[in-house]
């Protein structure tokens, strides 16, 4: 009885347990479905977020490419064959024209293409894609750092904003690296467009690249440095035909390529000077006149040749004709060996006897006047305009003559001189130098000397023997002093500082006994004749033009 009663009860219990398990399974399925839904939404959200980030990254790269330029751009060809999405190779786009945001290139719009997306984006030239607010909040002290002081616009300027600092850095970089016009065929440079007025006053910097001239050219206004002279020894000027006797004269033609040499071997030689071959052009033999002096007229039309004779020669370069002139009417001079020619090429002044100075016209070759000193005449020098003549001699005084009135304007004692032996005047007429028989050279300002001030601005006493020859170069920055009595007796004076060049004469070199010296019209060459019959040639590096 008990067994039958327990059986239905156990069945009911099992039924309830099965029902409960079924409900639990349904609950778990519902919970599982909810979890799947949540996971799906989360996954979808993450994908959308990832796409948004990728889109933002693409936009940022696009802006960076537009503003700063792309160093490379991946190629789309072949991407369908790649599984990892990486580019097979890159194309260099660095040569694409870039326009910095600080340049003002006009108001025209420019279209730049994005090769990855195939989009065309129009941007406005000169406008920044974005502005960094932090730049305005930062201050930079450009006065405290040495390398940043060049960015100052005013001397007392110190703190500037970050944006201003960046703008000045960019402007300074653009100034140092202006670029080239030929590399950008679509660019047009207009005068006055640059913010730096100094760079556009003499033309655009790109004009330099259109020529084959030297980029660094020394202007005529450059000052020669004192101390050491930069020079090079070249092939002897008369190496093609050396003289058999002492060289008494060397003189450059006004075109700077033609040099004459003359000496006691009675030959007048012409050389074309290039510093390498120095080709001989012509040699003329004067049978009856050992040459003491020869010189071109400043206009280059004639050569005046003289010796220890009563006559002199005139050689016409165009006609290649020699004329023998003299003796001069009314004069009894036995020698016309020393003379000077005026800068206007109109007058020749000869040293005469007993203190007389003989003035001869270069056109008629006739005597046009005489001047008389108290002592003997030893040296002469014309002023720059040919209107005045300086003379010195045995009485130790310097005379200044007016050739228009044939009268002496002023005479003064040459300080420390008992006998003047050499005179020379600068081409600008501001200075003249007087040499003596004791090796003393006094340099005067002509205006002060004529005004009564007899004190020289400099006395050079580096030589101990008689001064035979002196010469200013074309810009009066160098004064050459020559004494023929001793070997290597040549000094070069730096006139602006009134000091002697320490490296001249050249060490360990033999100049023999120097006799004469001349500078080319642009002072690029210096020629010096010696008693051995050679004409030494030097290149002065400071002067670019011969």
Curated annotation (Swiss-Prot):
Entry keyword annotation includes Nucleus: yes
Superkingdom of this protein's organism: Eukaryota
UniProt repeat feature WD, residue ranges: 242-281, 372-411, 413-454, 509-545
UniProt biased composition (Acidic residues): 24-35, 101-117, 193-205
Location in the cell: Nucleus, Nucleolus
PROSITE patterns: WD_REPEATS_1, WD_REPEATS_2, WD_REPEATS_REGION
Span(s) of short sequence motif DWD box: 389-404
Function: Involved in nucleolar processing of pre-18S ribosomal RNA.
Protein name from the UniProt record: U3 small nucleolar RNA-associated protein 18 homolog
């Amino acid at each position: 009885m008990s067994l039958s009663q327990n059986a239905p009860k156990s069945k009911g219990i099992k039924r309830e347990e099965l029902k409960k398990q079924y409900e639990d399974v349904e609950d778990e399925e519902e919970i599982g479905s909810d979890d799947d839904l949540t996971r799906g939404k989360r996954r979808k959200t993450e994908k959308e977020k990832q796409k948004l980030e990728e889109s933002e990254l693409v936009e940022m790269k696009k802006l960076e490419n537009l503003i700063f330029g792309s160093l490379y751009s991946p190629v789309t060809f072949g991407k369908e064959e790649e599984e990892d999405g990486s580019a097979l190779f890159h194309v260099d786009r660095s040569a694409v024209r870039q326009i910095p945001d600080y340049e003002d290139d006009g108001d025209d719009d420019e279209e730049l293409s994005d090769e990855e997306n195939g989009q065309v984006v129009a941007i406005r030239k000169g406008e920044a894609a974005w502005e960094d607010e932090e730049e305005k909040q930062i201050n930079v002290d450009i006065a405290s750092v040495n390398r940043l002081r060049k960015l100052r616009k005013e001397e007392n300027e110190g703190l500037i904003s970050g944006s201003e600092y960046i703008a000045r850095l960019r402007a300074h970089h653009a100034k140092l690296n202006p670029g080239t016009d030929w590399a950008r065929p679509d660019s047009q440079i207009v005068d006055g467009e640059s913010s730096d007025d100094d760079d556009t006053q003499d033309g655009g910097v790109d004009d330099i690249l259109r020529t084959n001239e030297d980029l660094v050219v020394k202007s005529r206004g450059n000052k020669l440095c004192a101390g050491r002279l930069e020079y090079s020894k070249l092939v002897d000027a008369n190496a093609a035909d050396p003289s058999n006797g002492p060289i008494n004269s060397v003189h450059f033609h006004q075109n700077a390529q033609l040099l004459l040499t003359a000496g006691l071997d009675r030959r007048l030689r012409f050389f074309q000077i290039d510093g390498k071959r120095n080709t001989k052009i012509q040699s003329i033999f004067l049978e009856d006149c050992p040459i003491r002096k020869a010189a071109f007229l400043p206009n280059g039309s004639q050569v005046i040749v003289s010796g220890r004779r009563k006559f002199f020669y005139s050689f016409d370069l165009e006609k290649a004709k020699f004329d023998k002139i003299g003796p001069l009417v009314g004069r009894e001079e036995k020698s016309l060996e020393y003379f000077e020619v005026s800068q206007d090429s109109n007058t020749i002044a000869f040293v005469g006897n007993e203190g007389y100075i003989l003035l001869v016209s270069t056109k008629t070759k006739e005597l046009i006047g005489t001047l008389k000193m108290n002592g003997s005449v030893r040296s002469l020098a014309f002023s720059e305009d040919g209107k005045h003549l300086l003379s010195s001699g045995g009485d130790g005084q310097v005379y200044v003559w007016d050739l228009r009135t044939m009268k002496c304007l002023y005479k003064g004692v040459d300080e420390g001189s008992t006998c003047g032996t050499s005179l020379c005047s600068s081409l600008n007429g501001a200075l003249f130098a007087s040499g003596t028989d004791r090796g003393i050279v006094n340099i005067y300002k002509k205006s002060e000397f004529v005004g009564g001030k007899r004190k020289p601005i400099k006395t050079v006493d580096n030589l101990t023997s008689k001064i035979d020859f002196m010469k200013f170069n074309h810009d009066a920055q160098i004064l050459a002093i020559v004494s023929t009595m001793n070997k290597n007796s040549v000094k070069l004076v730096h006139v602006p500082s009134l000091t002697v060049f320490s490296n001249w004469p050249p060490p360990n070199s033999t100049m023999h006994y120097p006799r004469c010296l001349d500078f080319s019209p642009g002072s690029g060459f210096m020629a010096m004749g010696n008693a051995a019959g050679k004409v030494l040639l030097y290149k002065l590096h400071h002067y670019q033009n011969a």
